[in-house]
Amino acid sequence: MNNTLKVEIWSDVICPFCYIGKRKFESALKQFEANDNIEITWKSFQLAPDLKTDTSISIDEYLAIHKGFSIEKTREMNTYVTQIAKQEGLSFNFDRSIVANTLLAHQMLHFARTVGKQEVTKERLLKAYFTDGKNIDDKQTLIELATEIGLDIDKLNQALNSNDFVDEVKADIDEAQQLGVRGVPFFVFNRSHAISGAQPVEVFVETIQQVLKQTQEEIILSDDQVCDIDGNCD
């Protein structure tokens, strides 16, 4: 890659297709000889900003209650998503996932960005939620994850307790609305091309090639597997 590629990704930590889409995007990047000229910024998006964290019910039960599905239907849906994730080398354990608000996690991501560790933090938060069954709305849990990553615990604690990055989280969400984002993941390349959803790897490859060649100026939008603002993932 001779040109700098700036990628902004709107994503939520409890969005399964955001994790799947991350892997597909990463697979696409591997097909280029050099990717050190890539600047990736993870933007905040909350599928359920008013969600109340509840450790007493399962994800299946939550979806059944709030989406009007049967338990059998929600299990079927989550099994389907788990199979898709497995194809990308991911292990989803929805039976362990905790119903949790993601505001604290997004604040942590913004803090991590200030010290150049946003990428590793994003990966750890996604794994914590989908694989490890961690409560990502619990400050102590986030501190433990931060210790693994190597973040400054005292500074992170201060940031979380003082809500230092709430405005940044809200600004990301407002920006997404201005761009017309209706679901995540949503990838924007050099502010000229966009991909919505966990698209096939070849779609990411083709888009990156187009951006680097600067063949077009308008946004090209591809739409596939997404979690929308109503919390529906398909």
Regions found by a protein language model. Name each.
Residues 23-129, 232-233:
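Structural alpha/beta surface segment adjacent to cysteine/selenocysteine redox centers
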Residues 2-3, 7-11, 17-34, 110-234:
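C-terminal cap of thioredoxin/glutaredoxin-like
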